[in-house]
Amino acid sequence: MSQIMYNYPAMMAHAGDMAGYAGTLQSLGADIASEQAVLSSAWQGDTGITYQGWQTQWNQALEDLVRAYQSMSGTHESNTMAMLARDGAEAAKWGG
């Protein structure tokens, strides 16, 4: 039977990268929102109402995406730490 080896430092770095990507998405979203704010003032009437509906959907989707990425990052980090602790406990049973 072969052994499965985990690279815990790399796994933790990956979780950190994921958290960074969530921050990047949030930052890009803020940049886009500032550009859209300039455009929104020019849209009035039915066009403005339609735009506001789309903008609300966009904002919610971005918030959901950032929150999901943050959640995935936290879950990945938590699971990695749990696996590391379990490996340590199992190794201790064998004197390693």
UniProtKB/Swiss-Prot annotation:
Pfam families: WXG100. Forms a tight complex with EsxS. Exists in heterodimeric and heterotetrameric forms. Gene3D superfamilies: ESAT-6-like. The keyword Ribosomal protein does not apply. NCBIfam families: WXG100_ESAT6. The gene is esxR. This is ESAT-6-like protein EsxR. GO terms for cellular component: extracellular region; protein-containing complex. SUPFAM superfamilies: EsxAB dimer-like. Belongs to the WXG100 family. ESAT-6 subfamily. In the heterotetrameric form, EsxS adopts a long helical conformation that pairs with a second EsxS monomer in an antiparallel manner that allows the N- and C-termini of two EsxS subunits to interact with an EsxR subunit at each end of the EsxS dimer thus creating a molecule with four-helix bundles at its extremities. It is found in: Secreted. Keywords: Secreted.
